[in-house]
Amino acid sequence: MEDNTFATSVFIQTDTETAFNYLCELKNLDDWTLFSRMIKQVDPDTWIGTASGYQHDLYYHVKKFNNDQFRGIEWHCGREYQQYFQVYPVFLFPSSYVEPGSDEQGVYFHWLSFVDPKRRTPMIMQGIETVHTSECRSLKGIMERNNGLSEAAVGRYKIDTYSIFVDAPLEIGERYITDLSNLDDWAHLLRQQGELTQDENGGKGEFLDEYNQRVSVKVRSHKLNQFYLIEQDFLYPDHNFIQRSPMVIIPCSVAFGDDKARGFILHRITFWPQDKPLRHGKLQIQDFGAESMNIKRLLEAEAGNLETFSKGMSYRQEYTTANSIEGAEPKPIAVSV
């Protein structure tokens, strides 16, 4: 797993628009965070406030992104106005997105955090899981209380994630992942069976899984501010089952607030039913992780960065544009191991 990335999630029994509007108001951080207290408003989307992980104040800034399937925001933090070095994308997936046709009333809140390895402190990395997980619990309690609940609602699904650093340009990664003709190379549990159709935002096609069961795959890419969310739907028509696993790819220059940081973070978001094990599709988070490793290896080879793969799954300070291979010709992707 990528060392500079942390994600936490929670099911909240409220509607998507209510959750979105609440999160867009930075002043509401006063109510549910450990110690982010807004002191002075700078502009409609920016405040100066205290911080849970530092002994000094920070600027807090919010951006919004909209989609017809889900909603989301980004929180940005930094010590100077409009100079932000921490970014926190937040996604709100309605229950009907996780399970099409579901009668569950609620939203799955997914909070993604990046900490620049140049600026992070030991306390930030040692405390981020504890603090963000507890803050999610606080947010859930407030929003469900406002919705009339007197105890914590239990969602039908839980979210699990897998993140990895890819030493290749973001646009190459987005094109490669959305092109279903590449799926045979990196998705080892699927085999193409039939025609593929592609357009500029994705494609669809027919595949067989490891049990020779039919799988209709649909991929759709969405540009969200400075990163992409790539929807991946795997429909099993003979079993009336669909597995959704959105993929977020965000450039390291944005994730870490460093213009010289090269490559991108690949973050897989997966949904797992709480009441029964899956019988079709990917059955464990390691299946998604293995695919991510394949994508990393193949894309880094295409970008000419053949030394990065052996150094592990995480972004390191040495991975800057100053240390990139200048003038190197992209290598063709090799499909052999």
Enumerate the language-model features and the residues they cover.
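Hydrophobic ligand-binding cavity/cleft-lining segments
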Residues: 1-43, 141-198, 327-329, 335-337
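Hydrophobic pocket/interface hotspot
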Residues: 18-23, 29, 47, 62, ...
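Short, hydrophobic/aromatic-rich segments at coil-to-beta transitions
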Residues: 41-49, 66-76, 198-206, 223-231
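Central antiparallel beta-sheet cores of small beta-barrel/beta-sandwich binding domains
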Residues: 55-63, 215-220
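Beta-strand/loop substructures that line and gate deep hydrophobic ligand-binding cavities in soluble
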Residues: 76-141, 146, 231-301, 306-308, ...
